[in-house]
Structure formats: structure tokens, C-alpha cells
Amino acid sequence: EIAVMFTEEGVNGAHQDPQYNVLYRNINMIRSFVDAAESKKIMAFGEMAQIDGAHNANATARDAWKVMPELLVQHAINSRMSERIGIRPDLICLSTVPPAAPPSPDLKLNLPYALALREFFDKYKMRAQMNTKYMDSSTREATVTHVLNLLISRLTSADIQSTITPDEGRNVPWHVYNIEALD
């Protein structure tokens, strides 16, 4: 129903990544992939951009950098499924949200990930490299993280900037940190 509503309303992009439901939410695998296939078909008809949300693993994992290979595999599965269903490659936007945040060494871990993602998936669009922050993080830490994320986006390029919803309200919406990073 959401895909139909978004298409009717002219929404230009939406998340659609069934593997997240299976891997992190323990939702029935068959239901997740059948629902996703139906949604993707409608999104293809409406020429809506698919924003791949494999980055959600980063928000969920305790040691997020350990899921880096898993993120690449998730992107591969979801992108290929989308293409097989009919979404054009230029409408598939991979989330480049980095697999690490402080106190890990940001550029040392995140720049190679950003480069690998672009090397492996060069026919898709790249969504800006921004990490979400938890409610208890300091304003300075969030701003510094976003400055470093912005630097990586500028060094590696990003095609779109999209908003993300807080994961169960645990993350502070990050628009203000983007603005402070640009300042």
C-alpha cells in the first residue's frame, strides 16, 4: 500500500531492503521478499528511486565496522533483485553510510569502505556518506563526525543527499549537524 501511495503522490524515492527485516528483525523471510518484490515492481512503474538501506546494520551493530563485508553483500543482493524486477540501475541508490563512528578512526575505516562501494557498484547512484548519532552523543562529537563524513563524500562523490528516519527514536535527526559541518 505504501508503494502505491508513494507512486500516486509522486514521491521520488523510498527505502526498500527486505534483507534487513530478515537479518535484524526476524520477520518471515518469504513474506519479506514477496512484499519487497511487489513494492519494487510498483516503484519501477513509478520510476521511483530505491534508496538501499543496508546501512541499518551500522545503526544496529555494536561493533559496526565488523559488518562491512556484510553490507557489501546486502547491497549486491538487494540491487540485483531490484534490477531483475525492473528498477533501472540509475534509480538504485546505495547507502554509503559508513560502517564506523567514534571512537574508531573515521578516515582509516570509512574511506576504504566508500572507495570499495563505488568500485564494486559503479553503475548505481551513491547516497551521501552520513552516520546517524545516538541521543546521548554530544553535539561536538556529532558535528565532528559529520565533518569527517562530509569530507569523505566530497573525496569520493555522492549523487544524492537523503533524509533518514531515526531508528526507533534512538538517533537524533541529523540535519543540524549537516549544517554545522558545512559551516
Task: Please provide the spans of the model-predicted regions.
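Anaerobic metallocofactor- and corrinoid-dependent redox/one-carbon enzyme cores
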Residues: E1-D183
